[in-house]
């Protein structure tokens, strides 16, 4: 009997695949997380109280992320990964829900690149003026290769200000090698478009091509050159390049973030011709804890659960907090 139990234990161990660890970047920080290979995908687990299993670097993974949940979920459970929920999504343009599992509509901010001229004509007059103004003020925009010279210019750009969009900027204060490494991912599928003034980089966009979509990974410009509107010129050139390459969509992260419907970033995207495209995001519970998590829709996070007025107040308080922190630092510098 003891031998049979021992043999059963060995069989059980053989059925569980080894769990490894892999490094990921989250909010500008490098973390080690558990991972396993499942049906050709690297699955990682993140979270503390509730463990979320997801496809590593899902945004740049080509093809369907999960072809068949009916086989993927059992394989995940056998993998040895301790997860409460499996989360994945369907990438546009295929947005008709395929699976009979719990899902919610997520969204992208996207430009339809099929016809550059049609996109240009639909832009608000002010956006077209800003692009022309950029050229008149001496800004040139071109595709550039990623090398040490470009990485140094990007490093200088990252160090212009510790704050971006009212909050601490992730890349500020990092050393050159770190900035170079973090901007050199997926180079075989990437393109860098730079905006130059008097032969100096004043802004850039990095896009990564995934199937028929181009994702904006980085977009940044010197605040000191805002009057030259480099970002408008960069977006226009990027849409033109995508149209020439036969790319369906240029995507700039989300259009709206949960109940945060209004912000300067949302307004910037709207003025530059980005529109909201919805797609299904699936959340499949794997444990009793996962069932509660999904039933209460806690995956939405604070931005998706708190009412808009509360979020607006919270953002105002956050801005005041960061401004108060900056004043002592500025006083010391003076």
Enumerate the language-model features and the residues they cover.
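A conserved beta-strand-loop-helix scaffold within acyl/acetyltransferase catalytic domains
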Residues: 13-53, 94-96, 120-226
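Acyl-donor-binding surface of acyltransferase catalytic domains
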Residues: 12, 65-147
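N-terminal accessory interaction module
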Residues: 31-89
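Amphipathic, soluble alpha/beta structural segments
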Residues: 155-184, 246-247, 258, 262-271, ...
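Aromatic (often tryptophan-rich) hydrophobic motifs at membrane interfaces
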Residues: 74, 185-294
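N-terminal amphipathic/hydrophobic targeting modules at extreme N-termini
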Residues: 2-3, 7-9
